[in-house]
């Protein structure tokens, strides 16, 4: 007897599919841009006198938000996720 499974599909907007396709095609570029941003943030923190780890996280978040747009951060997050799925 054959067991029947049901797959539930969730609709994904064309915008989301377009972003996934764009990032997938230029994955190395977005990963490099993210790495550059993180390197700049680390350089900025080097010159600050901060001891508390929690405060460093807050400063990193502030710098990340001020050095990139919300859309860029979304694209970087998507690139990191796609990269992790590819390299599983």
Curated annotation (Swiss-Prot):
Entry-linked Pfam families: DUF5497
UniProt cross-references to InterPro entries, sorted A to Z: DUF5497
Q: Which domain of life is it from?
A: Viruses
**Keywords per UniProt:** Early protein
Q: What is this protein called?
A: Uncharacterized protein ETS
Origin organism of this chain? Autographa californica nuclear polyhedrosis virus (AcMNPV)
Organism lineage reads as: Viruses, Viruses incertae sedis, Naldaviricetes, Lefavirales, Baculoviridae
Q: Which gene encodes it?
A: ETS
